[in-house]
Amino acid sequence: QAEEKFLTEQKSIMKQYGLENVKMAYSCPICKDEGYKNGQMCKCLKKEISNILMKDSGFENLENFANATKTSNNLSPYYKKMQEWCHTDFKKNLLLLSGQTGVGKTYLTRCMANELIERGLIVKMSTAFKMTQDFKSFHKSHNEELLNQYLDCQVLFIDDLGTEPLYKDITLEYLYLIINERKMRKLPTVITTNLDISQIRETYDERIYSRIVDR
């Protein structure tokens, strides 16, 4: 109804100024810059939301797989596999990318995030540190938007798990909430970390460990 009302008002204004025969130039030819088409959120609006979420987390500048193939690092053999994953139905909805600092994990996830945004998905990418600060803010303010950005995005990237402070009654509790809720809703989560499997088990409780390593 809102969509129809908008179109009616637009036509009325155009007619008022004698512009009913003038063709509008739209940024998005699919939804004609309305953000929705046939009651569904358009790809252009999803992209704009993803860009806002990325900017909020400090991940404005993404990479792409076309350039990645020209960049040599320890994860180069995985580029094609991860690019293919970006176009699947995400049956495996939690990916753990573990490795030492400097092997290219963040670069790879920037490529993946860009690929998914271009596919038309709402993507959120955050460092574990920034996410934990949002947990802390939510714990004090109960502003649900602070958690919903992690719960509701179609694909979530958590970068550098293990570098975040472990606040009592906050870090582990909310991290479990995010990972478990997304897993139940079959929403994919991609995690990068410098920790190996044994270190993950030492750092986090059994509930988080079992979901991260997908036991």
Task: Locate the predicted segments by residue.
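Hydrophobic residues in beta-strands of the RecA-like P-loop NTPase core, especially within AAA+ ATPase
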Residues: 158-159
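Loop/turn-to-beta-strand initiation segments
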Residues: 93, 121-122, 152-155, 185-191
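Pre-Walker A (pre-P-loop) alpha-helix and adjacent loop at the N terminus of AAA/AAA+ ATPase modules
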Residues: 59-95
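Short glycine-rich substrate-engagement loop in P-loop NTPases that contacts/grips substrate
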Residues: 74-80, 117-153, 165-172
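Walker A/P-loop nucleotide-binding motif
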Residues: 91-109
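P-loop NTPase Walker A phosphate-binding motif
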Residues: 107-121
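Interdomain "pre-motor" coupling segment immediately N-terminal to P-loop NTPase/helicase cores
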Residues: 15-59
